[in-house]
Amino acid sequence: MSSLAFNYIVNLLSRREYSEFELRNKMQEKNFSEEEIDDALSRCQAKNWQSDRRFSENYLNSRVQKGYGVGRIRQELRQLKGVSSDIIDEVLMESEIDWYEMAENLLRKKFPNYNEQQTPKMKQKIWQYMLSHGFRSDEFADLIGQNQSEWD
């Protein structure tokens, strides 16, 4: 057991939460062996210093504050942070976020005059912005008086 590997993880975790995937990548960059990585991670997880579930909850809250929807958050957690789909599903199910209300608030903030600007170009801009922020069309299309079929 390498105390150097363990100390490295503890040092990282003392600053912020990390997913297991992120910690593994950081330790591999520092050329720790797989055995050292596994051992250090196991010790931290046993002490509840590292938890993908807790990381996902914190990440969800931070991304919601920045105006991102469920699709974008799910994708980032899975692809960029390496969190398992099961954990992501649990965290999203347990969250009490009203994605429709969030989409409406973001739409009002980013496009304050969206009701008055009903040009096709403006609708296209809103549509692209909302989709790129991870909102499903059913969460915002009726807010701009539009059906998805109008864009097909």
From Swiss-Prot:
This protein is called Regulatory protein RecX
Q: What is its main location?
A: cytoplasm
UniProt entry keywords in alphabetical sequence: Cytoplasm
What species is given as this protein's source?
Haemophilus influenzae (strain ATCC 51907 / DSM 11121 / KW20 / Rd)
Which domain of life, per UniProt?
Bacteria
What family does this chain come from, according to its entry?
Answer: Belongs to the RecX family.
Q: Which GO terms describe its cellular component?
A: cytoplasm
* InterPro entries cross-referenced by the UniProt entry: RecX_HTH_1st, RecX_HTH_2nd, RecX_HTH_3rd, Regulatory_RecX, WH-like_DNA-bd_sf
Q: What does this protein do?
A: Modulates RecA activity.
Subcellular compartments: Cytoplasm
GO process annotations (BP): regulation of DNA repair
